[in-house]
């Protein structure tokens, strides 16, 4: 049985409240779960106690092989329970194909302008 530590939505319309639960990966989002190990109230202000975790039980379930979802892993990383791996996207900062073509065209135009300028400059001969 594949275990997940994930969010289960509660609350009312436009007022979400999430329970952090341990459930079988095949069960529905708000369906059957094994244990409730925390809560997250996104409506509270930033400095309030938005996330409540039962650290002892989370450590137990992590030891049993439960895998946290991305959002829950953020909470666990902030609490120091599990390290979130850094993501690496080396091509993110590179310009796209069209931008590279524009850069190459501008560079070529600058080189041609510099070459034309040196050709048209008069050569002074000192006698």
Curated annotation (Swiss-Prot):
Keyword Ribonucleoprotein found: yes
Record-level GO cellular component terms: cytoplasm; small ribosomal subunit
Bias-annotated ranges (Basic residues): 81-90
Chain positions covered by the region annotation Disordered: 80-127
Keywords tagged on the record: Ribonucleoprotein, Ribosomal protein
GO molecular function, one term: structural constituent of ribosome
Domain of life: Bacteria
Biased composition (Low complexity): 102-121
InterPro entries to which the protein is assigned, alphabetical: Ribosomal_bS16 (IPR000307), Ribosomal_bS16_dom_sf (IPR023803)
Biological process annotations from GO: translation
Basic and acidic residues bias (residue ranges): 91-101
SUPFAM superfamilies: Ribosomal protein S16
Family stated for the protein in its record: Belongs to the bacterial ribosomal protein bS16 family.
UniProt-recorded name of the protein: Small ribosomal subunit protein bS16
């Amino acid at each position: 049985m594949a275990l997940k530590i994930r969010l289960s939505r509660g609350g009312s319309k436009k007022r979400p409240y999430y329970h952090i639960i341990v459930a079988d990966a095949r069960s529905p989002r708000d369906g059957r779960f094994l244990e409730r190990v925390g809560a997250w109230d996104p409506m509270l202000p930033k400095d309030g106690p938005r996330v409540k975790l039962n650290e002892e039980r989370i450590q137990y379930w992590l030891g049993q092989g439960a895998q946290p979802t991305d959002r829950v892993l953020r909470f666990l990383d902030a609490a120091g329970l599990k390290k979130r791996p850094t993501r690496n996207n080396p091509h993110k900062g590179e310009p796209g194909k069209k931008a590279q073509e524009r850069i190459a065209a501008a560079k070529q135009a600058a080189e041609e302008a510099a070459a034309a300028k040196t050709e048209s400059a008069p050569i002074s001969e000192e006698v």
